[in-house]
């Protein structure tokens, strides 16, 4: 019986590796890794002699910076998660004491170190991304208390900064071309809508904790319409730019991807709470596919500023 008591989860002093990995949420790493890759492709620069930068940059964007942001968010969201998702590592007790905070700090430091080793622009982008991650979750700023600010911070960090970093690193730390910057900005705006989709699963907990997510502020129907608009409008902007730049067939592909999303969005709007996950799972991939299509469209077409 004594051994049984000693080995109970409540007596654990250190988190299990599986709990740390769950805290870092590998499933969330894909968007910034993809955006970094899009930024790389948009330069049109050969990978020859630069593979180490590509690999290091992808690791920086996903398993480091994004993972750090997830740990930060879970630590400062532990009260909300105790209501919405009590099975998560911190509220469940599998991440004992202040270990959630320790992991967030350690991963932040390691991310800054890797960014510094890659290049000056990578370090600057890493610093900005991590500042947004901490300001998103940490009082007194806590951007996520307001859905407009919080979703914007995520969109900039996950898409815009990652895209910018990929372009800058591959171009030898030169400032990316104007078309690449414009695409990064537009897809960052679109990511604002994607982030809103994630808020439909936590409406009750957000209300109780005073988190002004867009579903709380605008109501379910209003937030759903806003999410669709924020996703679609930037993509139509991308379509227009590709036409101006003479990338006609890529513009046609963007239209087809938009059409597929619109079909799913019409279904989503009928019952946003139940169908947000479906749109995230099947509509968002069309959005991110458009990112790569547009990156290939501008690759090598334009010189740097």
Question: What residue spans do the PLM features occupy?
Answer:
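Multi-pass alpha-helical membrane architecture of UbiA-family
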Residues: 1-305
